[in-house]
Structure formats: C-alpha cells, structure tokens
C-alpha cells in the first residue's frame, strides 16, 4: 500500500500481509471475488501515524435501473489496474486502459453474472474496476446524449484465453462481474461479519 503525504501518494509504501484464512473465508457468494475488511488494519496504521493513500468507489457510482435501460449494446469502458504487475513506480499510479463492451452489460453472458469487454485484458488484470467513462457525449439506445458519465459497472474476473496445441493466445477479452450483483454480495458479506 502506498503511504500518503499531504493527501497524495508518496514514494514510500508499506506491505500488508494477509493470512490465508482471511482470504479463504471472505468469498463473495458464488462470485469469483473476495472481500477483505480493511478497517482494523487502516485504524492500526493510523494509530502508528501512517496514512495510506487510497480511493473508494461508493454505491452512488453504480448505474441505476433507469440508466441501464438507456445503455447502448456497445459502451466505451475504462479500467484501472496492474497488468502483469506493471505500474508507474515513480508516481505510484496504476495503468489506465480503455476498450468497449463485447456483450451488453444487461445480459448475463452464458448464464453467468458477467459480461465481456474487448480491451487489452491480460493476466494481472483480474480485480481491476471497470467504469463507463464518457466526456462530452455518449451513446444511448435512442441516439446520442450530451454530458459526462462516470459509472462503476464491475470488476474484471478473468482473462479470456484460447488454448491451442502449442501455445495460449490472449483474445483481449475479459469477463467482468457486474457491479449490481457484486454490491449485493458485498452487502450480504457486511451483514454477515457484523453479526460476529
């Protein structure tokens, strides 16, 4: 984790090690995701006068049903992550990439709670948050709308690979777990840990 100085990431970082029981015990329902409660870790670091730089995505960034109704079948997407562990080590920033939806967000690809994106999705992309980000104008099912959009639509869970006899080839496609079902499972998880 990057240490914050004056509200910005510094060149300093701190490694936080989680034991396997935390990882194995925090699966989000049937999704290929886990949740790691960080409040106690962040509080402990704060008591040691160590401030961690982080950003959050709150539920206000999730698309509402009436917004989803106007999504186009093909939407521009932006995702943020560390493909193959790559990041800007000097500025302590992840890599931002863009692409399009390869299947409509509102459909369940092959009956799963996922949709596909067509972008530079490589190993190490799993866990990357995916957003619809439009500046100036954006498509709707009825035409074009003027304005800006920033909506959290999911998290990459898998890189799509074609296995061939002598090699694997990356299809530049990724599976994305939709933010709505993810939020429902996070809510269930929070209720479960609050009972303990």
At which residue positions do the language-model features occur?
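C-terminal cap/linker of serine protease catalytic domains
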Residues: 136-196
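Serine endopeptidase catalytic core focused on the charge-relay Asp
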Residues: 1-112, 118-119, 123, 127, ...
């Amino acid at each position: 984790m990057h240490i914050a100085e004056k509200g910005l990431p510094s060149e300093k970082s701190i490694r936080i090690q989680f034991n396997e029981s935390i990882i194995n015990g925090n699966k989000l329902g049937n999704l290929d995701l886990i949740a790691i409660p960080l409040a106690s870790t962040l509080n402990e670091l704060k008591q040691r006068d160590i401030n961690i730089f982080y950003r959050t995505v709150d539920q206000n960034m999730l698309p509402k049903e009436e917004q989803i109704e106007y999504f186009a079948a093909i939407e521009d997407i932006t995702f943020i992550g560390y493909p193959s562990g790559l990041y800007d080590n000097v500025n302590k920033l992840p890599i931002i990439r863009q692409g399009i939806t390869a299947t409509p967000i509102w459909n369940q690809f092959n009956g799963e709670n996922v949709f596909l994106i067509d972008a530079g999705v490589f190993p190490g992309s799993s866990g990357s948050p995916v957003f619809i980000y439009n500046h100036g104008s954006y498509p709707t099912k009825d035409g074009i709308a003027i304005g800006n959009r920033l909506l959290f639509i999911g998290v990459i869970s898998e890189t799509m690979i074609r296995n061939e006899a002598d090699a694997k080839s990356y299809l530049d496609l990724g599976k994305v777990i939709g933010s709505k079902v993810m939020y429902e499972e996070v809510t269930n998880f929070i209720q479960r840990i609050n009972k303990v």
